């Protein structure tokens, strides 16, 4: 198969869907088959993907664009580029595809927040993405979601034929593991000015992640005499000022640390240094950070919503969304009970081994084959 991959949505600092783009392309390129991959990407794409030199990938480097102008380019210029490469199929990795294409197409939907929680997106994104996603759902030969939860949401919200939409869970990179190297840990601690004992959150600082709930529960933990600090890892998204303001309002500026964006190379060590990982999100299409935390041997607390029970299973604590009391109680339990901590560490590592990028690529390739056999 000659497969086109639209990776032009890959941002300079990948998180979430950006990591999916990187890891899927790496796994597809490493697979032992005769497929030819043609990757459409902006200028930083090859460096971010960091494929081995011997990997046979045809690069189509396009002009760097802002997210808004990229979407216009996708509709107006990408079809002509695709036609010139003579690919059998184009896989669009981030919600949308060109309205006109000279080949079969597959589109990945990461979540359905544009329909379920539109208030969690900027006005510009609310204006564009719902209609573009509906059009992609109609026009694509097949759709991929990253969890069964998102698949069911898409079927219900977009009236999609269930036979047209497939689930390919995300994976966890082998670099996310227990690390015993004290020198490396000291280096990362100094680099990000991390405290000795801390509760960790990782993700964009934005409304969907529901960080005020965590900050309020943590305030109660401080009032209870905890010595653990709270470390919030991730780039500032829209409305991040609300979180900073709440930290100041609750007089937690000396107890809460903001690191900003942390590179993928450093993340495994940051996880390894944490005593507990908390992910209080309102909705997730998958929730990759909880899987990475479990692989690194960190107990996990998250919300009983959308894909998270599907990913975590019995390997962590799930609480109701927006329940500060439940989050506080769960944090007290895990931090205060070493036997329980060790149990969650063991179960989490076992659970994380069920997910791999090789499996993601294998299932994705099966979708390609089915599309080309029936189109």
Where are these regions (language model features)?
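Carbohydrate transferase catalytic cores enriched for Leloir-type hexosyltransferases
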Residues: 1-375
